[in-house]
């Protein structure tokens, strides 16, 4: 990561793992769905896109998330290069710094793309636990808590729709072993609350962070 237009190495972020390298079998594919890293730091054969017809969705942010699985699962071989070869410039207007309902809706659209491509290319059932967790995190968990952090009025109908759409896609998402292992206890508690009552979730979230911010301001505690 870098905050300037240069080749100076800033914070180093790993993308991918050495054990994912080699001919892609079931184990490697599951790992790549779960921990693929960013699509933009990879080099692909042109034929993967040309032969499959896979294209980036237009007019949304997070467009790489929508097709990452579909592209990787078209490949037969993957190699991880443990060198700094991509410099990601972050600025105040970048997607990692900007939270708005529109950005949240873009993230949800990218999540739908994950599911649509899994159905289109026929790998949903093969990798259902991995797709379920990936979709849950991108479409719902990350979007929900990003939306709550953002300023302004919180639309109960928007949050409710988000939760309902997740349940329609994966009714048993909370039983997923990756969800159980990788989502922290506090988030699980609040997600379960939202699934029962959106209004109760929003009130609890606001009260919790009002108290935490007060405590941090006056007592220096997080």
Segments predicted by a language model, with ranges:
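Short, charged, amphipathic alpha-helical segments
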Residues: 127-134, 156-160
């Amino acid at each position: 990561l870098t905050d300037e237009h240069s080749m100076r190495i800033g914070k180093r972020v790993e993308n991918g793992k050495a054990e994912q390298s080699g001919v892609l079998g079931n184990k490697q594919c599951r790992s790549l769905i779960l921990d693929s890293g960013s699509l933009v730091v990879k080099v692909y054969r042109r034929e993967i896109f040309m032969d499959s017809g896979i294209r980036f969705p237009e007019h949304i942010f997070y467009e790489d998330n929508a097709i990452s699985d579909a592209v990787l699962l078209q490949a037969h071989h993957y190699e991880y290069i443990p060198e700094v070869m991509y410099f990601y410039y972050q600025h105040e207007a970048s997607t990692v710094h900007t939270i708005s309902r529109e950005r949240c809706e873009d993230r949800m659209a990218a999540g739908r793309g994950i599911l649509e491509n899994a159905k289109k290319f026929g790998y949903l059932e093969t990798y259902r636990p991995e797709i379920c967790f990936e979709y849950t995190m991108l479409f719902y968990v990350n979007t929900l808590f990003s939306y709550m952090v953002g300023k302004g009025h919180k639309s109960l109908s928007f949050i409710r729709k988000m939760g309902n759409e997740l349940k329609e896609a994966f009714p048993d998402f909370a039983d997923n072993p990756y969800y159980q292992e990788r989502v922290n206890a506090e988030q699980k508690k609040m997600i379960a609350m939202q699934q029962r009552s959106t209004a109760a979730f929003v009130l609890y979230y606001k009260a919790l962070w009002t108290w935490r911010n007060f405590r941090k301001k006056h007592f220096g505690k997080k």
